[in-house]
């Protein structure tokens, strides 16, 4: 069942990448506001992304969290070119190299985590503790983003979106993996938490996309989501982490590759769908000369 889960996760992740590219294009055009609900392309992107998320949920019910999560990382190399295509341009070399570095580094890092396929169990106290920690992280990132701009703002908002997305994956893993043929187990507040957290994740994602730095925003979510999921799986669900001494050097190299790719993406210029208006545009003024003749001059910003 693990291989079936991996294949389903791959298809779902590709759909999620396409949906993200479509929604980011609209979020840059309209901003992270209610205006987005009037944009058909934003809804199409949302539907495709939702289908991808549903497939991801199915995959989580068939395979461990630490096995499924790394699959979504590889879609970064597809999402960035798709976003570039939306703006009618070819992807920059730095975008491709940065995306590959992040994807390879994070996938390498995740593959160091040993496989452990057992029925997940999460107590109410631990679940509430997880939500409290996620809430604090989101609050801190939102406050910090309000004082930042550019790539820094995009990555900080992506961190908040990533941890919420990871919480969705954790609850889906617990609900789906714990069914064991008993559908009555769906009657639990964990099941209700999934759509609520999913809506929060979507809102936070749109805020991150709206900054215009799709590469760094998407990469940020792709990095934070699986790392947070693996930590949650290890701390709350009893899933193992790599402890062998031989994994230390590979883990450091993988982390360096991931960080280097993220920095590369952060240095790229943002994409815009609206022309940039100069800060002090020259506005014509009218001056009367002689008997009613009009002379037009450019205003002096100084």
Listing of model-derived features with the role each one plays in the protein:
Residues 1-302:
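Polytopic alpha-helical membrane proteins, predominantly small-molecule transporters/carriers
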């Amino acid at each position: 069942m693990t291989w079936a889960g991996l294949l389903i996760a791959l298809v779902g992740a590709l759909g999620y990448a396409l949906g993200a590219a479509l929604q980011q294009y609209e979020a840059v055009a309209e901003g992270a506001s209610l205006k987005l609900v009037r944009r058909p392309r934003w809804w199409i992107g949302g539907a495709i992304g939702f289908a991808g998320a549903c497939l991801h949920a199915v995959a989580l019910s068939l395979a461990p969290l630490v096995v499924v999560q790394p699959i979504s990382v590889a879609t970064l190399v597809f999402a960035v070119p798709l976003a570039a295509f939306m703006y009618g341009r070819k992807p920059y070399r730095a975008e491709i190299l940065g995306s590959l570095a992040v994807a390879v580094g994070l996938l390498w890092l995740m593959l160091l985590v040993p496989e452990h396929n057992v029925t997940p169990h999460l107590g109410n106290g631990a679940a509430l503790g997880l939500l409290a920690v996620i809430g604090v992280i989101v609050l801190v990132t939102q406050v910090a983003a309000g004082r930042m701009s550019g790539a820094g703002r995009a990555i900080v908002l992506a961190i908040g979106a990533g941890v919420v997305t990871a919480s969705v994956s954790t609850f889906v893993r617990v609900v789906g993996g714990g069914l064991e043929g008993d559908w009555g187990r769906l009657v639990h507040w964990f099941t209700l938490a999934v759509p609520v957290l999913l809506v929060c994740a979507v809102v936070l994602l749109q805020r991150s996309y709206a900054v215009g730095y799709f590469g760094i925003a998407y990469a940020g979510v792709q990095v934070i989501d699986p790392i947070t999921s693996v930590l949650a799986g290890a701390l709350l669900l009893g899933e193992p982490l790599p402890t062998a001494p031989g994994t230390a050097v590979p883990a450091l190299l993988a982390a360096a590759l991931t960080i280097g790719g993220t920095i590369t993406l952060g240095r790229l210029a943002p994409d815009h769908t609206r022309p940039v208006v100069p800060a002090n545009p020259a506005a014509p003024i009218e001056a009367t000369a002689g008997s009613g003749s009009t002379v037009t001059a450019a205003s002096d910003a100084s």
